[in-house]
Structure formats: structure tokens, C-alpha cells
Curated annotation (Swiss-Prot):
Record-linked InterPro entries: NADH_UbQ_OxRdtase_chain4L/K (IPR001133), NUOK/Mnh_C1-like (IPR039428)
Recorded name of the encoding gene: MT-ND4L
Pfam families registered for this protein in UniProt: Oxidored_q2 (PF00420)
EC number: 7.1.1.2
Protein name: NADH-ubiquinone oxidoreductase chain 4L
Lineage of producing organism: Eukaryota, Metazoa, Chordata, Craniata, Vertebrata
Organism whose genome encodes this protein: Balaenoptera physalus (Fin whale)
Length: 98
């Protein structure tokens, strides 16, 4: 495993640890999810480039599309929760209150 792959896996694991530790605020959880998606994108792009697997060239682009959709839905949820409750606590996202 090369140093680049180790750094990408370290970035993914740091984002995952951030998501597990700082899960009280929705904004920090969204930032950690974006870090995870970015590291997955770079890992997928490097893996496809190094293996010369031409059939999977669209996989990083599709991953970016899903990351953009996740970011848009997350920001819409953040705005809705902030307008309703005044804070961005994840505790306010109880599905039984809807």
C-alpha cells in the first residue's frame, strides 16, 4: 500500500472519528460526511487510474453526484432545523415529532 493510499484512508478514518465524536451538531456531522465522501472519491479515482479499468471510469463521477445530493439534502435539513428550533442540534431530528 502506497503512502497516498495510507493518507486517504487516514483522512477517511479521521472523518469517521469526527462523525462519531462530534455528532451533537448537525453542521459538524455534515462536514465530516463531506470529508468521508471526498476521501472516497479520491480513493476511487486513484484506484481506477492505477488499475486501468476503463469500464469503471464513471464511478467517481457518480460518487460526486451522490455527494452533491447528500450535501443539498443535508443543508436543506440544517436550514429547516435552524429555522424551527433555533439551533442545529441532532437531538431535534426525532422522527416521532414530524
Amino acid at each position: 500500500m502506497t503512502l497516498i493510499h495510507m493518507n486517504i484512508l487516514m483522512a477517511f478514518s479521521m472523518s469517521l472519528m469526527g462523525l462519531l465524536m462530534y455528532r451533537s451538531h448537525l453542521m459538524s456531522a455534515l462536514l465530516c460526511l463531506e470529508g468521508m465522501m471526498l476521501s472516497l472519491f479520491v480513493l476511487a479515482a486513484l484506484t481506477i487510474l492505477s488499475s486501468h479499468f476503463t469500464l469503471a471510469n464513471m464511478m467517481p463521477i457518480i460518487l460526486l453526484v451522490f455527494a452533491a445530493c447528500e450535501a443539498a439534502i443535508g443543508l436543506a435539513l440544517l436550514v429547516m432545523v435552524s429555522n424551527t428550533y433555533g439551533t442545529d442540534y441532532v437531538q431535534n431530528l426525532n422522527l416521532l415529532q414530524c
